[in-house]
UniProtKB/Swiss-Prot annotation:
The modification N-acetylmethionine is found at residue 1. Its main location: membrane. It is a single-pass type II membrane protein. GO terms for cellular component: amino acid transport complex; anchoring junction; apical plasma membrane; apical pole of neuron; basal plasma membrane; basolateral plasma membrane; cell surface; extracellular exosome. CDD domains: AmyAc_SLC3A2. The modification Phosphoserine is found at residues 103, 134, 165, 406, 408, 410, 527, 531. The lineage of its organism: Eukaryota, Metazoa, Chordata, Craniata, Vertebrata. There is a cross-link at residue 166 (Glycyl lysine isopeptide (Lys-Gly) (interchain with G-Cter in SUMO2)). GO terms for biological process: amino acid transport; calcium ion transport; carbohydrate metabolic process; isoleucine transport; L-alanine import across plasma membrane; L-histidine transport; L-leucine import across plasma membrane; L-leucine transport. The keyword Cytoplasm does not apply. Residues 102-184 are cytoplasmic. This is Amino acid transporter heavy chain SLC3A2.
Amino acid sequence: MELQPPEASIAVVSIPRQLPGSHSEAGVQGLSAGDDSELGSHCVAQTGLELLASGDPLPSASQNAEMIETGSDCVTQAGLQLLASSDPPALASKNAEVTGTMSQDTEVDMKEVELNELEPEKQPMNAASGAAMSLAGAEKNGLVKIKVAEDEAEAAAAAKFTGLSKEELLKVAGSPGWVRTRWALLLLFWLGWLGMLAGAVVIIVRAPRCRELPAQKWWHTGALYRIGDLQAFQGHGAGNLAGLKGRLDYLSSLKVKGLVLGPIHKNQKDDVAQTDLLQIDPNFGSKEDFDSLLQSAKKKSIRVILDLTPNYRGENSWFSTQVDTVATKVKDALEFWLQAGVDGFQVRDIENLKDASSFLAEWQNITKGFSEDRLLIAGTNSSDLQQILSLLESNKDLLLTSSYLSDSGSTGEHTKSLVTQYLNATGNRWCSWSLSQARLLTSFLPAQLLRLYQLMLFTLPGTPVFSYGDEIGLDAAALPGQPMEAPVMLWDESSFPDIPGAVSANMTVKGQSEDPGSLLSLFRRLSDQRSKERSLLHGDFHAFSAGPGLFSYIRHWDQNERFLVVLNFGDVGLSAGLQASDLPASASLPAKADLLLSTQPGREEGSPLELERLKLEPHEGLLLRFPYAA
């Protein structure tokens, strides 16, 4: 019979002890006859051997248990008979022997019960017939551990591939097939590499060139803010450098880049001897106050430009009879205040200074000799283009403020003519834009055009220059007893405490700061756009026709976002007929542009507007933007 063990099974082979109950009586007789306990045990074992020799079938596990129980009863009965027939001493000795023997036999019998339960699995190694079972020493299967592989996959894994040896690998690598394959792959690699290199070269060659950014100074990046009268700027009962220091946060909110301050030096009206450009008038503060103001302004990225116009309290700003003396004083003052840390200077009314061009050239050399980052501003009341150009010819980096645009009238065509003529005459020179050298916008413009001019000044190529109060539309004519050139700044409704109702909330800084549609809010937005957009910072300028009464132009720089400005100076609504034929290919107009802001309320900002159907309200200005298109 072929042995078929289960997976990972263990075959058990043992020789059990049998205590058949049918032959236990002989053991009892031996005990009752006075034999010792060893004889009784021997009889029980002998009876078991006789049972094995008889050839009877092996009892089952339950029968074995019955036999063991019957045998135990017989042994107990034999013990009782022994007690009845023996003397006490012998009884005690026999009792101890029987008790020990029974304890040992009981322990053995319990183990035999456990072994007999496994009997069906313990068959003879060679059980061809029942006769073989009669042999007392018949061989039975013992405990044999057989380890069987779990499955064929495990057997296959045992014989896994260990790879080629070095000699085998070299032999295969040198075969003709692999040699051809390696050459083919190497050729494909270099062809791919050369293709990518050629593609990169083509992209670089055909890509549009990025324009080099022009060198820019700090005054190129934003507006300048003039405070000619400290007392008027700070209001009644104030007007010193310490008070101005407290207003620097307000100037910072306007996003202005420079503060044009003063004059604040000592000046006796029309007395050159009592005019000291090196000393600060005690009414305004001390040198220490000025130094503190400089440090605080620099922390807020605001540059300080000092006005050194000598006779600012007199009739003639330059003491016409003592020009050389005054020129020497100015020269000394430039060197002194440069050392003190100022960022530039302003001199006004230079049309009253004899040989102004030569003096300006000398002062410019002193300023630039100290640092290229220092600025000189000259102011004139002239609106004549030729006179303005004569002042600019010999002074390359001079920034000039004038009344040139104050004669613009109220038509878009005339304003367009003035701007384009000025830009063409000055060429590549950096310009500045204002309506005067010191006065407010309201001195030249009606209230309905203030927003329009703010938009224009912030978007023309150059530096916009404003006076304090221009951001809120400060109008001296609307205030009782105020001078035209320096009215009191309206911070809140308490600016005129002696005249109740003289100032309304919408006229003040406080009231307009809370109104997103106010002139002040528009000023701040335009100033912010002007300082961060490349096209507005140093972009090209192209004016083009848009229809009667309109002034339109485009600002663009390289591949940056473009800005379109359309201004309606008229008193009626107009339709803009934007003619892109006037523009170069680099400044072509799209069909639509997004509205960035309008000077009039009611338009949805960010909405696309069709340029062919563009309509403007009276005195409305639009700032639109559109992306670069190759």
